[in-house]
């Protein structure tokens, strides 16, 4: 007979600050936060499916589609009979977190060559860090186990594993960096009108590659067949993670502009001003041919 032991698990995914703040548009900010929430939610649902109980955050996980946002971490408890079972659950939690973005990554590598596919996969694999620590509850009070796990989590996060990027036998990435994160090489680029006319793209975009499209997905300035103009602008270059953020739930005119966000407090005041509202009504009426005197 194998006896069950109860374990407390703390799960966390990052990087948070760098991922969210690497942005040029309000959609980038929205997508960064939303993606981390969805990745954590997928891990939570898997954990519950394995018989786990979520302690924090407290949400109605029976209706996951109604959950708009959650933190990038959760605390749960689960009963397991062996250390191997616990380790398998932790490994699966890490894998489940990335499933949310696999489809977007696969969309990028569609119809690309092996060199570019490898480059995209390396950037994808090296970016997100999923951390899990677990401790047996036993006869110890919950707060004692939890506090010890928090200390372990801090230690684990500070002991980061280093992965060396290698492309075609060349150590490191040489070439133009992403407009969002400024760290990873560009994998998706939209040409400017001038580059379309001259049929030339700056050599800085590529890494000694002939033909150049082996290293970067290049779109013409007005080509919206594969990527819309609001997803990637002229002259803009995006890395794998930045491209996924830009594509994620991106619809035309869905997000407010940064200018409108800065002026929202003034718009709220104007809505309370009857004179302004009457003026707006007259202007809108004149557009419809019903101008009032």
Give the ranges of each region predicted by the language model.
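Regulatory and interdomain segments flanking nucleotide-handling catalytic cores
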Residues: 1-293
